Swiss-Prot record:
Stored Gene3D superfamilies: 1.20.1280.50
Protein name (database record): F-box protein At5g25290
CDD domains: F-box_SF (cd09917)
InterPro entries reported in the protein's UniProt record: F-box-like_dom_sf, F-box_BR-signaling, F-box_dom, KIB1-4_b-propeller
Record-annotated F-box domain positions: 11-56
Organism: Arabidopsis thaliana (Mouse-ear cress)
Length: 397
């Protein structure tokens, strides 16, 4: 029901407030209050979209503390916001814009909008229908994997679940991908699209079961890298979602050695990590991160497949260094590049980073929220953000 309010000397409905008055009010709102205001009605939503793209599209960080609290950090405002919703019971797996893929204590999957009460219920995990695998729930957090080729079964725990998410708000479409992080089993991915009541199997190539990183691009393709130095591209664009192995793109790459042309203190507590990312044009990037625990110095290097390979490169694809992203920035938590825009606070030639091993989830990894400039080799940290269990950069939609 509309509420009567007084504007000047007139009594009107809040859904009919003139645009110029709304704009003057919206200018004074924080980005969180602006998100709350835009869901009041379609009129307010239209005004917010036309007027304040800057406030709502700057990169934000969602923070997860050790005590279970979930907060938002806006670097431009240098402010931390606490959600009015109780999100402590959820485990966040992935995100696309405002939408987050979450798992509750009963191992139920949902997609939630961080700035509203919208929630999409997803099929249960044990609705998975595979060619070689079936999944049976045997407890609130435990599952039994039945493999047709073996007489025995394997057990999984919800803490080992990994996920990817893509959402198109305009088309009201989404793609959800998940699998259990277990290098000994489950060399297939489970996925579903909007309107489906179960998860289907996306087989990966034999030998790619030890997945080290995954990227979901535009809901059409999944890129996988493995500890065995394989890269695979899976196609989800067909209606049935399954491609034959001959349609998959598989390559084996040669990881670069530690750079020797840049001054960095190497010590026993210094380690390298690798991620993959996909540019807006579809080019795959290999991201090398080097971190020194003694000096807490971190540096990144980008590589891509050699565009002019030697004829002798039959088994391994050589990589060449990338010294610029042009007018793009890399959100490593999502594994994608986005157009840079100083008005939106998205810095060009920059890598937005929190942690390197979302898939592997190694114990030695902890959040290191920073922005690294590829050209100047400078790192910007946010020292006020500490005692965190996890964190994730995202771009509000």
């Amino acid at each position: 029901m509309d509420t009567l309010i007084i504007v000047g000397s007139m009594v009107t409905l809040w859904s009919e407030i003139p645009m110029d008055i709304l704009r003057s009010v919206f200018e004074r709102l924080s980005f969180v209050d602006l998100h709350r205001a835009k869901i009041v009605c379609s009129h307010w939503y239209s005004c917010s979209k036309q007027s304040f793209l800057r406030k709502t599209r700057s990169p934000l960080v969602i923070l997860f503390s050790d005590d279970g609290d979930c907060t938002l950090y806006n670097p431009e405002e240098a402010r931390v916001y606490k959600s009015k919703r109780d999100l402590s019971r959820y485990r966040f797996l992935a995100n696309s814009g405002n939408w987050f893929l979450v798992l509750d204590p009963r191992s139920n999957l949902y997609i939630i909008d961080l700035f509203s009460e919208k929630k999409i219920n997803l099929p249960p995990l044990d609705s998975f229908k595979g060619y070689k695998y079936n999944l049976k729930k045997v407890g609130a957090r435990k599952f039994k994997e039945l493999v047709s080729e073996y007489p025995t079964s394997f057990h999984h725990h919800a803490k080992d679940l990994r996920g990817l998410l893509w959402v198109d708000e305009k088309k009201e479409e989404y793609v959800v991908v998940w699998y259990f992080r277990n290098k000994y089993t489950m060399d297939s991915l489970a996925f579903c699209k909007n309107g489906e009541d179960h998860y289907r199997e996306m087989p990966t190539h034999y030998g790619l079961h030890d997945i080290s990183d995954m990227v979901l691009q535009r809901g059409d393709h999944i890129y996988l890298s493995t500890s065995c130095k394989y890269l695979q591209k899976l196609d989800l664009s067909r209606q049935e979602g399954i491609r034959t192995k001959n349609d998959d793109i598989i390559s084996r790459y040669q990881l670069p050695c530690r750079p020797t042309n840049y001054k960095l203190v190497y010590d026993a507590k210094c380690w390298c990590s690798y991620n993959i990312a996909v540019t807006s044009s579809g080019e795959v990037l290999f991201v090398l991160s080097i971190f020194s625990q003694s000096t807490r110095r971190r540096i990144f290097f980008l590589y891509k497949e050699d565009p002019n390979p030697s004829p002798s490169e039959v088994i391994y694809k050589n990589l060449v260094e990338v010294d610029s992203l042009g007018d793009e920035a890399l959100l490593l938590d999502l594994g994608i590049t986005v157009p840079a825009d100083s008005d939106l606070g998205i810095e060009p030639n920059s890598i937005y980073f929190t942690r390197h091993d979302r898939v592997a989830n190694q114990k030695r990894s902890s959040p290191d929220i920073c922005v690294f400039n590829i050209v100047t080799k400078t790192l910007k940290r946010f020292p006020g953000l500490s005692s965190l269990k996890d964190a994730r950069w995202f771009l509000p939609s």
